[in-house]
């Protein structure tokens, strides 16, 4: 199999960034991508690339971005050999954590029902039509596709996980020049104060950051004046000022630092310069929303909860509850 040609996949978004005046990001991004794919490639990258390359060509692929599953169809259909190659290639990109997706009748039942989160968030958003959007910690890009389905002009997702990137490319490979891109970089890799996005999403990221206030300031720096922040994170019950810092792990995750109360989150947003911050949803995460499937065969939420009291994590902390907040940059 040929080596992964990152220029083929990322030159269009680099050109877009140049054309929209983001030359600082373009310069840094070229260096980051060179290091990622040429100087220090991931040990599994060849395997994932081979799986991507093995997917069958479908000349008449169509997509519906507004269903619960991102759905690819073909009016002419796929023959049995192509369907076998399709499933084998997609299984070569396991585990699939964020979705679901439907590739020409092959349904990928992902670990997370990411459509449930979208259904909770979407009614509260400013109209996404014509907006330029950044999705921080986007996983395999499920929500990026839903944003495009809502009419976004350009969506850029960032997530350092290379497997997520290959899963994203499995979808994009059938869509041609869709205005959605996924960059395998971290939030910290972005230039400060770009101020170029109309909406920035950060969902499932804040609790992984040692300094949550710095993360909020970084997010604010991505937004133009009047831009909208959509923040979703783990929370706990408690008064303003209260935040849980786990002793070690939370739900078996090592990299969880702060689980604030909703009043504390509102104060953080106020102190970091956002306006009109409000809580639009609070939902407990259940084993119906996050679970082991045939496409993600490792441990999942049920294994991270106390078997005698599933309202608590296995470490004895309150079970996962997620809040979505929306705020604007003045």
Curated annotation (Swiss-Prot):
Single GO biological process annotation from the record: tRNA wobble uridine modification
The entry's keywords: Transferase, tRNA processing
A GO MF term: transferase activity, transferring alkyl or aryl (other than methyl) groups
Residues at which carboxy-S-adenosyl-L-methionine binds: 98, 112, 117, 137, 187-188, 203, 207, 322
EC number: 2.5.1.-
Origin: domain of life: Bacteria
Catalyzed reactions: carboxy-S-adenosyl-L-methionine + 5-hydroxyuridine(34) in tRNA = 5-carboxymethoxyuridine(34) in tRNA + S-adenosyl-L-homocysteine + H(+)
Any Pfam family hit: Methyltransf_9
Residue ranges of the region described as Disordered: 309-330
Record InterPro entries: CmoB (IPR010017), Mo5U34_MeTrfas-like (IPR027555), SAM-dependent_MTases_sf (IPR029063)
Family stated for the protein in its record: Belongs to the class I-like SAM-binding methyltransferase superfamily. CmoB family.
Function according to Swiss-Prot or TrEMBL: Catalyzes carboxymethyl transfer from carboxy-S-adenosyl-L-methionine (Cx-SAM) to 5-hydroxyuridine (ho5U) to form 5-carboxymethoxyuridine (cmo5U) at position 34 in tRNAs.
Subunit relationships: Homotetramer.
Protein known as: tRNA U34 carboxymethyltransferase
Lineage: Bacteria, Pseudomonadati, Pseudomonadota, Gammaproteobacteria, Pseudomonadales
